[in-house]
């Protein structure tokens, strides 16, 4: 149906969802490497954050933890470099041609990783590599649609048991 309505449209992945997928797989590997540390919610919060968003005392705490787990330190650094690459925006076509081999190298490293979660992530990114690479050129996303959907879900939870669809529809129109 989409191809009929917009035959020349290019699919672009949503940056938020790509970064979230990377973080989820990274945390899954972390749980495998350090099952005890992964239950520490403070460490979980530190490992999920981008390095640029850490306060100095948090950076010290994370550095101490990663120093005691060298394998995690390598994975964390890899994830940070991949995230930095994916967070680039509004690049020229020339810059995108320069960035594409770097992305492909990251994908190859993931696919040849010794961890099943990272291999799966590598295969996923490989199958979506064109759509992921388009994130650098095109900044439009579906954030507004997701926001409306969230508001409608909240409204639906609040109106549980109501049977009048007209009232529900009116509430959606007013909220969104």
How would you label these PLM feature ranges?
Residues 1-6, 10, 16-20, 38-176:
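Acidic/histidine-rich catalytic cores and adjacent linkers
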Residues 18-37:
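Short alpha-helix plus adjacent loop in nuclease-associated cores
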């Amino acid at each position: 149906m989409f191809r009929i309505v917009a035959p020349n449209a290019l699919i672009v992945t949503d940056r938020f969802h790509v970064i979230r997928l990377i973080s989820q797989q990274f945390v899954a590997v972390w749980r495998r490497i350090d099952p005890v540390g992964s239950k520490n919610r403070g460490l979980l919060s530190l490992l999920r954050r981008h390095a640029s968003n850490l306060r100095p005392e948090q950076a010290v705490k994370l550095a101490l933890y990663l120093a005691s787990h060298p394998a995690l330190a390598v994975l964390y650094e890899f994830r940070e470099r991949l995230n930095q690459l994916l967070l680039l925006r509004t690049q020229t076509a020339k810059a995108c041609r320069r960035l594409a081999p770097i992305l492909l190298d990251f994908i190859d490293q993931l696919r040849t990783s010794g961890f099943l979660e990272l291999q799966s992530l590598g295969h996923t990114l490989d199958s979506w590599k064109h759509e992921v690479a388009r994130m650098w050129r095109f900044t439009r996303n579906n954030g507004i649609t997701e926001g409306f959907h969230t508001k409608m879900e909240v409204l639906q939870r609040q109106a549980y048991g109501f049977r009048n669809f007209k009232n529900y529809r009116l509430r959606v129109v007013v909220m969104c």
